[in-house]
Structures are given as structure tokens and as C-alpha cells.
Amino acid sequence: LTNTNNYPLHSLQNHQWFKLICGASFQELNVIRNLTLVYALAGADCIDVAADPAVIAVAQSALQVAENLSDWLKNRGFPPVKKPWLMVSFNDGEDPHFRKAEFDFQQCPTNCWRPCEKVCPVSAIVFQQPHLSRSGASQQEYSGIIDSKCYGCGRCLPVCPSGLIYARSYVSTPQAIAPLISELAIDAIEIHTQIGREADFARLWQSLKGWVKNLKLLAISCPDGVGLISYLAKLQDIISPLPCSLLWQTDGRPMSGDIGAGTTLAAIKLGQKVLDANLSGYVQLAGGTNNYTIPKLRELKLLPALTDYYATGREKQLNNPININSLSLPARQGQHINNYINGVAYGSYARVLLAPIWQKLEEMQNDQVNLADSLPLENFPGLLEEALLLARELVTQIKPQNIRKTV
């Protein structure tokens, strides 16, 4: 990794920004470490993690490992990778990204077919399974929701036949984390908000603004709704003057990118709406983004046209079997370059994409019977390269220049 602090800003300016969302409520340290490592090596510009000191520390350690693997990258023909920015997320009120599902398994009917277990995208719901704590210590068989795995997608809430599952929401406590912005070399923060919460946003901003001088980027994430643009304009007044860059994250359909291709339409539609408002700052999609997002953005002229890409042919492969033309949105005509989307953030899709790798890693680690501790991903170079190739198929959609050299 090359420690070039301005590289992510260059990506924003050139409409090639790629952000990995680990999850504002996701705290499974081993997975966060490996996600950070793989997507940093794949060329991500930003890694977005929970405002949790343990999560921040494990992400930082993964970035250091990525830096140590620069020769490994070069020897396999991968392009050199710049160090991504590390971002932490806060919320100014109740928000689906900042919640955990809960239920008392002792109330579950014995004959329940457990649809909650089947619908959970991260296998956070278990029944009579042994699992490890965040520290790695063994625990007894457990039934319920593994708190560190749950990231608040809410898919289990409506499917429980007995209505036993509920969401436990929480609001950020920036007083504990804000001082770490400088200490832990955090590059960016993101504030999740919703229309009508100007007072809540202002209170949170008062707790954070003293540390903003140490940041390279402030991101504000907001879903669509009546009065969105005027609300964002009010937020801009609250944070002005801002000593760092500003990014609007348009949260189309939160935590849904792994469900299907069509979820990307809400993100694109909202991004187009914010672009048309001509607010100051960069615009980045999130919420329903997946491998169909970039091809659709190019088709709609919301990203610069490809000129000399397709060297690997992977983009064409990645777009099958769905025809992106079946995802209907009106195309723009003759837009100025400043009205292009600046980047895309991927959360659930990027995580699910690598889930088979984590399963293989667990099996390989279990085979190391003579070791007291499980070996990290980088100790299995073949598996690391397999994960990297998967991640790069997604990253190179928006960074077509990052093709792999023949070795």
C-alpha cells in the first residue's frame, strides 16, 4: 500500500470512489479485519466501520497488514494500492443502521420452522450452536442472536410467526469516540440522519465539530422523503464553515444490495435527485448498491463513459445473467461532468460476496489442529488471492484502470 492521503480525494474528483461499508452495527472483529484487508488490497478508497474502539483498532491493524503485503501484490501482477481512508459512523437519532435484533429463544414454539434463521444474511441467528465471543474465547452452546454479527437489516422482524423478534436501537455517544479521531488516525466521519431532525443533528455536530479539523471528509447519509433537499440545505448551513470535504450519501434502500439487482434503482434515483439539487459537496450512492449499479449508472450517463476498458472482460461477466436495460430509469442527456455521481458505497452486497471465502477459511483454520490460535487469512495466500479476485471484480467496475497485469 502506498500511503498517499490524497488518493481517495482524487477518486472522488474523478468519479471513481469506492467505499466499503462494514456496518455501523456490525462488530464481528474477525470478519471486519478480513473485509478491510481484502478490499484495501482490491483498491477501496474508504473503509466505513462502527464507532467502536475495538472495531476501529482491528480495521487499523488490517490496513497495516495490507501495507505489508505490497510485495505479495506486485509479485502476482496486481497494481499497487493506495491506503484507503478509515471512516466511522454516528447517528443523530433512531436509525435502522444502528440497531440489533433480539428475542428470547425460550419463548420459541418447539415446532417452529425458524424462518428467522433462514432469512438472516449473516447467520447471526442460531439454535444450540457453539460460538466464540468477540475476544475469541469459547462459549457454551447458544441459542438466539449473536449480537456482534447482527447489523440491523431487519429481515427477521416480519417473518417470525410468533412475533417474538424486536429491534433494539441505540444512538451514538460521540463523547467517547470523538477524541479517538486524532489518536487512531481516523480520516472521515459519517453522520446518519433523517428529514426533520435538524435539532438532533445540531446537538451531535456540537460534540463532533471540535475534531473535524483533523478529518479529510465529512459524509452525511440520509434516506429520501418529502422535503429532502431543503433539509440537506439546512444541514449544510449548520456545518458551515467546514474545513474538510463534504459528501452526501444517498441512502436509497438501506441494507438491501444482496437481495437482487432491482434494489439498486432506489439508490440511483435518489442520487440523481440530489445531483439535480446542485448542493455543494460530492454525491455517493448507497442503500441497495450491487454489481448492477455501475453499469446502470453508465447507461444513464450518471458516470463518465468507458473508453478503453474491458481489457479483462470481467465487467461483462459480472453483469450476467440480468439485462441491465430491464432496470428502467430515464437517461440523462448532455450532462456536464460535475453532475456525475462521484462514487458508490457497498455494504451487504460486498460482504455477502466474500461469505464463501470466510466459510473456506473457517474450514482451513479448523484443520490446524495443533495451533492454539487460528491462522489469519494472509497465512492462506491461495485463499487470499481468491478473495481478492472476487473483490476486484466489484472494485474495478468503477476503477477500470486498475486491471491486473499478466505475470
Where would I find each of the regions flagged by the language model?
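N-terminal amphipathic alpha-helix/helix-capping segment at the start of soluble metabolic enzymes
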Residues: 1-22, 72-83, 407
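Conserved mixed alpha/beta catalytic, RNA-binding, or beta-rich assembly cores of soluble enzyme
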Residues: 33, 44-45, 51, 158, ...
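Active-site mouth loops of central-metabolism enzymes
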Residues: 16-31, 92-110, 164-172
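Alpha-helix-loop-beta-strand connector modules within alpha/beta enzyme cores
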Residues: 56-88, 206-217, 269-278
